Structure formats: C-alpha cells, structure tokens
Amino acid sequence: MKSNLENFNFQTSIREQVVPSRKKVILPAWLEVAKPRLIPLLLATTLGGMALTEEWPLSSPKLICTLGGGALAAAAAGALNCLWEMDLDKRMKRTSNRALPSGKLSFNTVFLGAVSCTFAAAMLLISGVNYLAAGLTLLGLCSYVILYTIILKPRTTQNIVFGGVAGAIPPLVGASAATGHVGLSGWWLFGLVMLWTPAHFWALAILLKDDYASVGIPMLPSVKGSAFTVKAISRYGWATVFMSILGVFALPEGGLLYVIMLLPFNGRLLQLINRLKSSPDDLEKAKGLFRWSILYMFGICLLLLISRTQLSVDFEQQSMQIFLSLKAYFNI
C-alpha cells in the first residue's frame, strides 16, 4: 500500500511539472483562453515556410501582417476550443480552474472575443498579404476546432494523427504569403509537422492518460497503454527524422549546412525515444521527450532560417570548391 501511494504521489508531482508555468505564472483570464503557449511554435513554422521560398526575406509589412494574422487566428482557435470543452474541463481536476469552467469569463464574452480575433485575422491577412494566406489560416482554425476538437478528439485514438493537420498548416501559410502559392517545399514542411505531431503529443498524453481516461477521451495511452503508445511514438519519430533530412532538397540554397546542423537534433530525439521505450511508464522520460520535441521543431525552423543566410551559402560554395579540388587531385 505504501509503495502504491508513493508511486501515485510521484506521478502526480511529475504531471504538475509538465508545464510548470501553469503553476508559476498566472495569466489574465482573457489571455488564458487564447492558449498563448501554443502560438510561438505555430509562428515559427510559418517563418519556416517562408524561409523555404526564393522570396525570403519578406518585406517587413507583409511579415508583420502574416505573423499578426496567424497569432490572432491561433488565439481565436484556442478560445473556441475552450468554449467547446468547457463542460469537459469542469470534470477534470487539472483544468477545472481555467477561466471558463471557474466562471472568471462568460461564454458570450469568450465567443465574442474569438469572433473578433477571427475577423481581425482575416482582414489583416487579406489586406496585408493575400487571399490564399488568409484562406489557409482560416482553414487551420476550422481544422483545429471542427475536425480535431469536435469530431476526432472524442471519438478515436488516432485523433491527433489526422487532427494534426491544423498544426501543420502554418508552413503553407508562410509559403503562400511569400509567393502567392504553395510549392513542394512548403508541402515538405507540412509533412514534417504532420509526422512530428503524434510523437510530440503522445509523449504528453502518457503523462496525462489518467486525466483523459477519467472523462472518456480516447487518447492512445489511455486506451492502448504506454507500451503500445511508445512503439507508435518510435515509428513516428523515425519517420520525422527521415522527413527532416529531406529538407536538404527543399531549401533553395544552404542545404549542406542545414543537414550538418540537423544531426544533433535528430540524434537527441531518437535517444530520448529509445530511453522511453526501455521504460514506457517512466513519466520523467516522457516529460523529457515532450519538452525536447518542442525544442526540436523550434530548432528545425531556426536551421531553415540560418540556411538562408549568406554565411550558409558561402559555406556551401566553399565546401563544393574543396570537394572539386579533392576530386581533381585524386583524379576521381
């Protein structure tokens, strides 16, 4: 009995540390419903989509309008998600103190705010960017609220696999903002985010599987268990690594430096996945993988931006010159 109690306390403490800022930083109620912690990564992948185009860097006004519109749309999506799941949040201890279930904000107030943010995002993107970027942004919003939150999340363990399309749309927005269309490079980053999402989210779901099970949400770890989930994480992790390497062909230039700098990111991701495979119920290892997966995607986007600098281009040219010199020297 004592060991079970100690194990419960350990798991509870780990769950409370997954996103420690929820404990340490009290957000204003109106900001909390916008889920601001999710927005920076969405904007990072938007920048990544831009960096894959020949038109990078964009003019400052277009860049600001794209990122501003994306942030407003993401805030609207977060608020609408909170509205739909308000009753669900009331039943979960972890979420019962959120702004809506606790009564800090009313349904009408949040709904009005979400509609206002959606309208502002559309106007900003239409006037400052183009119709395609605006349409894709609204498609991402609807995908998150309707496809994932309403349709898939309460019905299938594969909810995040197909619902992950919402989080993968920002690279398409970035590419379309830069060029007016979505090329193959933009679709590459879309695919990378789609493959990365299950491994990223299921690591978090392992930590919260009891919470999801208590309210009947069929997250994969809650239904199939941690061991089964970690095997799925491993498959998606390897697919993510393979897809990330293909980025060398997606970049207009600077791909050599990208693929070299990519190695430690992929190595660390696979290392953490293998550690979790050895102990699927180890919440510390699940937490470590979840946190690194966030840094991983930020890192990928940063590498894409670095690869478009003159330094990266010069490195690639000098490397090619060295290769050709060695080839001539050895008569290859």
Swiss-Prot record:
Belongs to the UbiA prenyltransferase family. Protoheme IX farnesyltransferase subfamily. The lineage of its organism: Bacteria, Bacillati, Cyanobacteriota, Cyanophyceae, Synechococcales. Converts heme B (protoheme IX) to heme O by substitution of the vinyl group on carbon 2 of heme B porphyrin ring with a hydroxyethyl farnesyl side group. It catalyses: heme b + (2E,6E)-farnesyl diphosphate + H2O = Fe(II)-heme o + diphosphate. Its EC number is 2.5.1.141. It is found in: Cell inner membrane. InterPro entries: Protohaem_IX_farnesylTrfase, UbiA_prenyltransferase, UbiA_prenylTrfase_CS, UbiA_sf. Gene3D superfamilies: UbiA prenyltransferase. One of its GO terms (molecular function) is protoheme IX farnesyltransferase activity. The chain crosses the membrane at residues 63-83, 109-129, 132-152, 160-180, 188-208, 245-265, 286-306. PANTHER family: 4-HYDROXYBENZOATE SOLANESYLTRANSFERASE, PROTOHEME IX FARNESYLTRANSFERASE, MITOCHONDRIAL. Keywords: Cell inner membrane, Cell membrane, Heme biosynthesis, Membrane, Transferase, Transmembrane, Transmembrane helix. This is Protoheme IX farnesyltransferase. It is a multi-pass membrane protein. GO terms for biological process: heme O biosynthetic process. One of its GO terms (cellular component) is plasma membrane. Pathway: Porphyrin-containing compound metabolism; heme O biosynthesis; heme O from protoheme: step 1/1. Carbon 2 of the heme B porphyrin ring is defined according to the Fischer nomenclature. It comes from the Bacteria.
